Amino acid sequence: MQINKYIDHTILKADAPKSKVQQIIDEAKKYDFMSVCINPTWVSYASQELKDSDVKVCTVIGFPLGANTSELKAFEAKNAIENGADEIDMVINIGAAKSKDWNLVESDIAAVNAVKGDKLLKVIIETSLLTDDEKIKACQIAKAVGADFVKTSTGFSTGGATVHDVKLMRQTVGPDMGVKASGGVHNLEEAKAMIDAGATRLGVSAGVAIMEGLTSNDNY
């Protein structure tokens, strides 16, 4: 198992200075991680820093609340892609999901999907705020719209990825769609548990700890 290729090496904290973003980029190059996951303000910089590597640039849209309008999410995604993003992790309209307004959840995802072109779209459903039935419905909609992945969490809400949720999401979307576990994966043992449950990508700030067989204290 090339576990490095499961890892989106992540820094999304509001107070992360350029030096920390550079550290994440350098570590991603060293360990040949699948991507760095960074806030949109750093996309242009990361794209330049990673242009001679295989590491992708991943960014977040409508993050972390998912409460922006669909039009704004689409603009944000388009702008990120123009700046060099290879992968887009968008947050669903969580309030719409809790209101059972599934048409709005669908059109919101579709608005971003329409501008992604050949880039990857991951849909964050924020599992800690949804019932199992809502998780299933959100995953079904993301798949129907044409997203490439469903993703558990922002890492900024009440909880992160769990084995239960990853299994449920995998069962819902079937074998061909990506499932990203993010938030609360701190070490190699936890990473393997998520992969065994069906995750094909891991959103972690603990990428180096996972590779070194250590445990990180970071929440994401």
From Swiss-Prot:
It catalyses: 2-deoxy-D-ribose 5-phosphate = D-glyceraldehyde 3-phosphate + acetaldehyde. Keywords: Cytoplasm, Lyase, Schiff base. Its EC number is 4.1.2.4. GO terms for molecular function: deoxyribose-phosphate aldolase activity. The active site is at residues 89, 151, 180. GO terms for biological process: 2-deoxyribose 1-phosphate catabolic process; carbohydrate catabolic process; deoxyribonucleotide catabolic process. Pathway: Carbohydrate degradation; 2-deoxy-D-ribose 1-phosphate degradation; D-glyceraldehyde 3-phosphate and acetaldehyde from 2-deoxy-alpha-D-ribose 1-phosphate: step 2/2. Pfam families: DeoC. SUPFAM superfamilies: Aldolase. Its main location: cytoplasm. GO terms for cellular component: cytoplasm. It is found in: Cytoplasm. InterPro entries: Aldolase_TIM (IPR013785), DeoC (IPR011343), DeoC/FbaB/LacD_aldolase (IPR002915), DeoC_typeI (IPR028581). PANTHER family: DEOXYRIBOSE-PHOSPHATE ALDOLASE. Belongs to the DeoC/FbaB aldolase family. DeoC type 1 subfamily. Catalyzes a reversible aldol reaction between acetaldehyde and D-glyceraldehyde 3-phosphate to generate 2-deoxy-D-ribose 5-phosphate. This is Deoxyribose-phosphate aldolase. It comes from Lactococcus lactis subsp. lactis (strain IL1403). The gene is deoC.
